């Protein structure tokens, strides 16, 4: 298990854009599982939406990408590199994510060719799929 401080040693994201709280499983360059505890104090709820708080889907996808980045950047050969979005395919949102939910963020790296890779990403709440997508990334 990796704490927030250990996560910050691997990926460059910081408040207010660090969207994962813990990594609970990792196989370097293969897969990782992270957690995001969604609270009513999230800054984005001030505008999305003030009277009906829903976590923006793009931030769920970003949280998934950060978990995937952790899986890639945890490997010693990738230390100090950055992981950039190169594409998002077949993204579907199937459940709203609201304050009090705990997002389980799972990313499996499916293919790596040079600095480009693709991963299958799934975010769940209480075992129910909230978001699923294919994420393409580039390491630099």
Swiss-Prot record:
Its EC number is 4.2.1.59. This is 3-hydroxyacyl-[acyl-carrier-protein] dehydratase FabZ. It catalyses: a (3R)-hydroxyacyl-[ACP] = a (2E)-enoyl-[ACP] + H2O. Belongs to the thioester dehydratase family. FabZ subfamily. The gene is fabZ. NCBIfam families: fabZ, PRK00006.1. CDD domains: FabZ (cd01288). It is found in: Cytoplasm. One of its GO terms (cellular component) is cytoplasm. GO terms for biological process: fatty acid biosynthetic process; lipid A biosynthetic process. Its main location: cytoplasm. Keywords: Cytoplasm, Lipid A biosynthesis, Lipid biosynthesis, Lipid metabolism, Lyase. It comes from Exiguobacterium sp. (strain ATCC BAA-1283 / AT1b). GO terms for molecular function: (3R)-hydroxyacyl-[acyl-carrier-protein] dehydratase activity. Involved in unsaturated fatty acids biosynthesis. Catalyzes the dehydration of short chain beta-hydroxyacyl-ACPs and long chain saturated and unsaturated beta-hydroxyacyl-ACPs. The active site is at 48.
């Amino acid at each position: 298990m990796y704490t927030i401080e250990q996560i910050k040693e691997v990926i460059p994201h910081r408040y207010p854009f660090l969207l994962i709280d813990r990594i609970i499983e990792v196989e370097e360059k293969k897969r990782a599982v992270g957690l995001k505890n969604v609270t009513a104090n999230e800054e984005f709820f001030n505008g999305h939406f003030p009277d009906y708080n829903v976590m923006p889907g793009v931030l769920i996808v970003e949280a998934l990408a950060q978990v995937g980045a952790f899986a890639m950047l945890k490997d010693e050969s990738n230390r100090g590199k950055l992981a950039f979005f190169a594409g998002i395919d077949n993204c579907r949102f199937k459940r709203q994510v609201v304050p009090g939910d705990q997002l389980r963020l799972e990313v499996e790296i499916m293919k790596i060719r040079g600095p480009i890779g693709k991963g299958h990403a799934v975010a769940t709440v209480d075992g129910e799929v909230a978001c699923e997508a294919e994420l393409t990334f580039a390491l630099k």
